[in-house]
Structures are given as C-alpha cells and as structure tokens.
Swiss-Prot record:
Annotated localization: Cell inner membrane
Record carries keyword Magnesium: yes
Keywords annotated in UniProt: Cell cycle, Cell division, Cell inner membrane, Cell membrane, Cell shape, Cell wall biogenesis/degradation, Magnesium, Membrane, Metal-binding, Peptidoglycan synthesis, Transferase, Transmembrane, Transmembrane helix
Enzyme Commission number(s) from the entry: 2.7.8.13
Known catalytic reactions: UDP-N-acetyl-alpha-D-muramoyl-L-alanyl-gamma-D-glutamyl-meso-2,6-diaminopimeloyl-D-alanyl-D-alanine + di-trans,octa-cis-undecaprenyl phosphate = di-trans,octa-cis-undecaprenyl diphospho-N-acetyl-alpha-D-muramoyl-L-alanyl-D-glutamyl-meso-2,6-diaminopimeloyl-D-alanyl-D-alanine + UMP
Pfam families with a match to the protein in the record: Glycos_transf_4
Enzyme class: transferase
GO biological process, one term: peptidoglycan biosynthetic process
Gene symbol of the encoding locus: mraY
Primary location group: membrane
Source organism: Chlamydia trachomatis serovar D (strain ATCC VR-885 / DSM 19411 / UW-3/Cx)
GO cellular component: plasma membrane
Function text: Catalyzes the initial step of the lipid cycle reactions in the biosynthesis of the cell wall peptidoglycan: transfers peptidoglycan precursor phospho-MurNAc-pentapeptide from UDP-MurNAc-pentapeptide onto the lipid carrier undecaprenyl phosphate, yielding undecaprenyl-pyrophosphoryl-MurNAc-pentapeptide, known as lipid I.
Source species taxonomy: Bacteria, Pseudomonadati, Chlamydiota, Chlamydiia, Chlamydiales
Protein name, per record: Phospho-N-acetylmuramoyl-pentapeptide-transferase
Record-level Gene Ontology MF annotations: metal ion binding; phospho-N-acetylmuramoyl-pentapeptide-transferase activity; phosphotransferase activity, for other substituted phosphate groups; UDP-N-acetylmuramoyl-L-alanyl-D-glutamyl-meso-2,6-diaminopimelyl-D-alanyl-D-alanine:undecaprenyl-phosphate transferase activity
C-alpha cells in the first residue's frame, strides 16, 4: 500500500471514532459527574463570561487516546518495538490528563494536580519518550530542521546529545502545556490542532527521518479525531476535551516534531499555541517584576474576551492566525 493509503485510513479512523463514539461518551461522562465547574481564582469577570459553560461534560479528549491506540494497532506491524513504544506513550500521556480531570472532578473546584507535580510528571514522561528516540536515531538525533535554513547538524560530542535531549524534552512538555492553555474557548484548541496536525503531516510525508511513517499515522489520526470532536465542541459546546485531551494532543504534536527532527518548526506549526504561552509568560513576568499586567487577562484569548469580542469572533480570528502560521511553516520547509 502507498503511504497515502495509510494516511487516509488513519484520518478516517480518527474522524469516525470521534463522530460515532462521542455521543455515548458524553452521556457516560455526565453520569460519572465529569463536569466543568468554571472556577477561576481572582477572575470573577471570567467566571461571569463563562457561566453558561458550567456543568458541561469534560474529559472528552479520552476519545483522542482511544482513536490513536486503535490506529496504531491496525496500521503498525505488531511485532515492531516502535509500535509498542507508541502505544505506551499514548496511554501514559492520556493517563496523566485523565488523572488530572479525575482529581478536578472529585474536588469540584476547578483544580487538579498541582502545577509542580504536573510539571515533574510531564518532564519524566517526556524524558521517557526522548531517550528511546535518541538511541534509535543515533547520530541523526543531532540534526535539526531549522525553518528557512535547512538541516543543521551538531558535532558528535556528549554536550550535543545533552542539548538535543533538552530541546526535545522542552518541545514535548512545552507543546503539551501550550495546547492546555489554548483550550479555553469552544472549538479553539481542537480547531487549531486540526490545522497544526495537517501542516505537520505535509512535512512528515516528505521527511526522511527514520520514524516519519509513525508521525504520518499519528498526525492523520489526531487531525481526524479533532475534526470529528469539533462537531460537539464548537460553540455552543456540548463537551470539553479537558486536560485528558489538551495535554495529550500537545504531547503527541511535540513528539512528532521530535521524531521529524523539526522541533523549531513548532514555532510556526503551533503558532497560536506559542502566542498563548508567551502571553502567560509575559503577564506573569510583568506582574512579578513591575506589579503591572500587560494584558487584561491571560492567556491571550481571554484578553480579547475582556475587550468585548464575542467568543466566536476570537476563535475565528485565532484559527486564521494559526492557518497563516502553518502556511508560513510549510513554505519555510520547502524554500530552503
């Protein structure tokens, strides 16, 4: 079969899995009490703006995990260790988000794992992902695809492996948290992920990395499942992906960038995620240093809500920005 056949099959698995499993999943989540309680510390205005979202089922992102496992089992050779590496990675990152949503559900105050504990677990999981890739890729792990510049290789020294390991770990953890920050409006994170995954898929299909095929299948599955999820997550949302979905999606996108040796390309392919994270970093840094806020509220999408833009307008504009970033990213790959 041609690689395109695998891509179409993976996309179809993700799409139909989300479309047909989501309805019974929403009913089950309601029965289990997985509901968004819209508790925002020191953000009374934000609670007021989002009061209509209270008690909407959350943790719907578990469908992305199921779809990804199914796609890997159906399309990857079962005897290869890389197949089980993918399944283990998918399940562990899915479990992290699920546990976080479980804790939120039990406490019913909008808080799950503490930021420190979550960050520590994320780094451990990311390291567990990067190390096998580093040993499998060997010298290839020292090469990076820099936008507009092409392939750049580091010298074969121990510090090169350490630097490459740090960059790869940062890409996975950073993207995971960035998608999590972006998941604050109906259809925003899922819509941006569809665009980002399709953009990275174009890169993966033309990439010569050892495990590029794995990326093609995963990215196509995620794009399809996010597209199907949008039917239920677009405004007015009937379900949220929760941390189960956002942490998982970001980690998978980051892992694919690592596999393609294209971590720096995430600056374009995940452009809107980068902007959301930067807005939080700038906001927190400014307040700690100057006791002044740069934005009315962070992440960035809430800033525009505070300025009076409707939720649909913010989502539409952000998705346009993400599309532009992805187009620039694709151009950056092929012009070098």
């Amino acid at each position: 079969m041609l690689p395109l056949t695998y891509v179409v099959k993976a996309f179809s698995i993700g799409l139909f899995f989300s479309l047909f499993l989501m309805k019974p999943l929403i009913s089950w989540l309601k029965k289990q009490g997985f509901q968004d309680h819209i508790h925002k510390d020191h953000c009374e205005k934000l609670e007021e703006l989002h009061k209509d979202k209270a008690y909407i089922p959350t943790a719907g992102g578990i469908v992305f995990v199921f779809a990804s496992v199914l796609a890997v089992l159906l399309l990857f050779p079962i005897q290869l260790w890389s197949t089980w590496f993918c399944i283990g990675t998918i399940l562990l990152w899915g479990a992290l988000g699920w546990c976080d949503d479980q804790i939120k559900n039990r406490r019913r105050v909008g808080h799950g794992l503490s930021a420190k504990h979550k960050f520590l677990i994320q780094n451990c999981l990311a390291a567990g992902v990067v190390l096998p890739i580093m040993f499998a890729y060997k010298e290839s792990f020292l090469s990076f695809h820099l936008p507009f510049l092409g392939i750049v290789s580091l010298p074969h020294h121990w510090w090169s492996y350490l630097l490459s390991f740090a960059i790869a770990t940062l890409a996975i953890v950073g993207t995971s948290n960035s998608v999590n920050l972006t998941d604050g409006l109906d259809g925003l994170a899922a819509g941006a992920m569809v665009i980002a995954c399709l953009g990275m898929l174009v890169v993966a299909c033309t990439n010569g990395a050892p495990w590029a095929f794995i990326c093609c299948v995963l990215l196509a599955t995620l794009a399809g499942s996010c597209l199907g999820f949008l039917r239920y997550n677009k405004s007015p949302a009937r379900v949220f992906m929760g941390d189960t979905g956002s942490l998982f999606l970001g980690a998978m996108l980051g892992m694919c960038a690592v596999l393609l040796r294209a971590e720096f390309l995430l600056l374009f392919m995940g452009g809107i995620f980068v902007l959301e994270s930067l807005s939080v970093i700038v906001q927190v840094g400014s307040y700690k240093l100057r006791k002044k806020r740069v934005f009315l509220c962070a992440p960035l999408h809430h800033h525009y809500e505070y300025k009076g833009l409707s939720e649909k307008a913010v989502v539409r504009n952000f998705l346009i920005v993400e599309l532009i970033c992805v187009v620039v990213g694709i151009i950056a790959v092929f012009v070098d």
